[in-house]
């Protein structure tokens, strides 16, 4: 049962009619995308905060129509109809609502709580209609405030709760951002329980929580050392199909260590292996602290079923078994490195290369096609797919734009051709790799030079060049080609921007690790292909219970990667 807070008036007998009515709405209607219980209370809410709504406000402020005037529209056009599009746009931008939005955005950027509250009070005095956006920015700015003390009172927190109440009174429909900012307010007041209540209430409004929605409650409970409540929030996340990231898992790891819950530490390490793979320095240090702790020394079994462990490793694809802590006694914990073959320089154990399920690859290719068709001109991408079926498969796909610019001030066809030749040399079929280039690079600039034009014609005649159409993002093309051909992808692109985040953290990092080839160019060695490592750079758990944890680095070509090796001093 939810606690009765200022954010849960619907659970009080003295609640406002708005929330009381919502409890009577059948669930089949409550979650319908077109149903909104607020319509019966505020007919203009359907366009509240939208461009249409702002137009309505401008027109009402300029022309207070009556029925007779409206009936006379046939004989004379209203002044608003004579306004140019530019004038209408200017009127919208200068409306009280738009000006308030601009000023609140500036307060949000600067974290200026006092100015935001002053603007809010002024807007209410002047009768400015606040939209969902206005309220969300106000709540966000108030949530930035730190907890008040006797010597330093903070008006942002107390006023934030009042603003939330006023939003409900004004019958403004809340969204995910509203509840998330409310949760942040609660945590700023040192009340993670209230923050968790906010997340629970989202379902009553048909709102799907996001990862950021859970952060205030989860981190709040972890800071307080309330492990049970933190696990409850985590379970709610799993139920809502919200996937945690490293900060959330690190917080759960810390609270599990502090409460000496070895089973939870083990499960969290497995989740870090699955979802994060390589950990940041702070998490790396925390894991090192665990293996050096007395609790870790005393945790584990002396005997285990070797066949069961081995079968679990095989069924999991290699690199882990998930059967719990193996062995007893003190851990030998060292920071180390791997050699080029994946052999630990500390314990001499060779790390494994974790398999990729072929079914996963096919599913990923289908997902990639769907995403590309949503963001590219579908006909263009389908045309590329048909071309690839006729000319493929290839042993390697080259991100031409990236390869021509590595360590170069301007695009270099010489370097791109050098990359093509190196890839052809290592190809089992000795076939030319597929070069993906934007049409602008194929038709203009250095491409017009006779030598480069001849090179492009050679690739084109061999069916090894594809020019992506104007306005397209060539990233979709070279990535799809490499995935569908199950071949190497030659690019120094780290693939971390928004486009690649759409692909998720489950399969794509594993695929990239096994298929991406990067180049390095030096005066001494010239151009060198850096092949995928023969082992997986991911947290690994051996059949004897030994752990190897990799630290994430920006560029492991330039910086050697540190690993944590944790092995029992005594083995059965």
Curated annotation (Swiss-Prot):
| Binding of Mn(2+) 2, residues | 475, 493
Q: What is the effect of changing residue 474 to N?
A: Abolishes ribonuclease activity
GO BP, sorted A to Z: tRNA 5'-leader removal; tRNA processing
Cleaved signal peptide residues: none
Subcellular location, principal: mitochondrion
Q: Which top EC class is given?
A: hydrolase
Cofactors demanded by this protein = Mg(2+); Mn(2+)
Q: Which CDD domains match?
A: PIN_PRORP-Zc3h12a-like
The question of whether Transport is a record keyword is answered with: no
Alphabetical keyword list: Chloroplast, Hydrolase, Magnesium, Manganese, Metal-binding, Mitochondrion, Nuclease, Plastid, Repeat, Transit peptide, tRNA processing, Zinc
Recorded catalytic reaction(s): these are: Endonucleolytic cleavage of RNA, removing 5'-extranucleotides from tRNA precursor
Which Gene Ontology MF annotations are present? metal ion binding; ribonuclease P activity
Designated name of the protein: Proteinaceous RNase P 1, chloroplastic/mitochondrial
Species annotation: Arabidopsis thaliana (Mouse-ear cress)
């Amino acid at each position: 049962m939810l606690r009765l807070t200022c954010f849960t008036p619907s659970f009080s007998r003295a609640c406002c009619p708005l929330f009381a009515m919502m409890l009577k709405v059948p669930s089949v209607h409550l979650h319908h995308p077109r149903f909104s219980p607020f319509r019966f209370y505020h007919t203009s809410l359907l366009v509240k905060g939208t461009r249409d709504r702002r137009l309505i406000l401008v027109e009402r402020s300029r022309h207070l129509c009556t029925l007779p005037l409206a009936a006379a529209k046939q004989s004379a056009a209203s002044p608003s109809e004579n306004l140019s599009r530019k004038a209408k746009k200017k009127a919208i931008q200068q409306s009280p609502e738009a000006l308030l939005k601009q000023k609140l955005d500036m307060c949000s950027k600067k974290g200026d709580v006092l100015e935001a509250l002053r603007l809010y009070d002024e807007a209410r005095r002047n009768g400015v209609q606040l939209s969902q956006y206005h309220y969300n920015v106000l709540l966000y700015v108030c949530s930035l405030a730190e907890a008040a003390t006797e010597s330093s009172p903070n008006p942002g927190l107390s006023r934030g709760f009042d603003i939330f109440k006023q939003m409900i009174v004004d019958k403004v429909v809340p969204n995910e951002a509203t509840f998330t900012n409310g949760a942040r307010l609660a945590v700023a007041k040192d009340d993670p329980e209230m923050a968790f209540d906010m997340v629970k209430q989202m379902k009553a409004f048909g709102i799907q929580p996001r990862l950021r929605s859970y952060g205030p409650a989860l981190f709040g409970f972890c800071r307080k050392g309330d492990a049970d409540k933190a696990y409850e929030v985590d379970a709610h996340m799993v139920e809502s199909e919200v996937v945690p990231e490293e900060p959330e898992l690190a917080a759960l790891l810390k609270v599990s260590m502090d409460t000496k819950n070895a089973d939870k530490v083990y499960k969290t390490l497995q989740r870090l292996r699955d979802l994060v793979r390589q950990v940041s320095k702070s998490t790396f240090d925390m894991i090192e602290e665990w293996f050096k702790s007395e609790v870790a020394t005393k945790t584990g079994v002396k005997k285990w079923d070797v066949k069961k462990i081995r079968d679990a490793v095989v069924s999991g694809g290699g690199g882990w078994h998930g059967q719990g802590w193996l062995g007893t006694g003190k851990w030998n914990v060292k920071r180390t490195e791997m050699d080029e073959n994946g052999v630990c320089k500390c314990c001499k154990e060779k790390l494994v290369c974790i398999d990729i399920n072929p079914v996963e690859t096919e599913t990923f290719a289908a997902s990639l096609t769907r995403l590309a068709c949503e963001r590219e001109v579908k006909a263009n991408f389908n045309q590329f797919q048909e071309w690839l079926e006729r000319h493929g498969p290839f042993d390697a796909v080259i991100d031409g734009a990236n390869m021509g610019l590595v360590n170069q001030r301007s695009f270099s066809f010489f370097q791109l051709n050098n990359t093509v030749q190196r890839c052809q040399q290592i190809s089992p079929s000795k076939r030319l790799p597929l070069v993906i280039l934007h049409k602008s690079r194929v038709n203009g600039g250095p491409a017009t030079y006779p030598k480069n034009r001849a090179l492009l014609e050679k690739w084109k005649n061999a069916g090894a060049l594809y020019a992506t159409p104007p306005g397209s993002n060539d990233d979709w093309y070279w990535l799809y080609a490499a995935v569908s051909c199950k071949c190497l992808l030659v690019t120094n692109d780290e693939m971390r921007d928004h486009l690649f985040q759409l692909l998720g953290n489950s399969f794509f990092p594993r695929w990239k690790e096994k298929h991406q080839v990067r180049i390095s160019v030096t005066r001494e060695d010239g151009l060198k292909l850096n092949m995928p490592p023969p082992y997986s750079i991911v947290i690994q758990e051996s059949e004897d219970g030994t752990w190897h944890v990799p630290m994430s680095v920006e560029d492991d070509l330039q910086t050697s990667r540190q690993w944590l090796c944790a092995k029992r001093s005594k083995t059965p």
